[in-house]
């Protein structure tokens, strides 16, 4: 697999990570017990309410697993490589590295970060 394909996969994973964090945040802030409209209350069955709450719990668990998967990569690949991955493909800042290192060092570390992150992803999946 070449570098462009790896970068595309990393970008997709990080975009999904961002979506998952936003959805989980909105689920955590949502009111689980909204005000009751008694007409709706008597028309709906209790099983549909239970299904709704069960679905929310399962969705939260699934989102949490996916978020932890990406955040765990920081401890596996190291802070420096994780920082490179986030700056390049999550925040998409173009010239953030110019204050830290030379061009050759940046590209060498970027290549190593891509390979380390991709190896982590493929080892889990």
Regions found by a protein language model. Give the residues of each.
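N-terminal interaction/assembly modules
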Residues: 1-75, 125
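Residue-level detector of well-ordered alpha-helical segments, enriched
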Residues: 9, 80-84, 109
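Short amphipathic alpha helix immediately N-terminal
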Residues: 76-92
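Helix-turn-helix DNA-binding module
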Residues: 91-105
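DNA major-groove recognition helices of helix-turn-helix
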Residues: 106-124
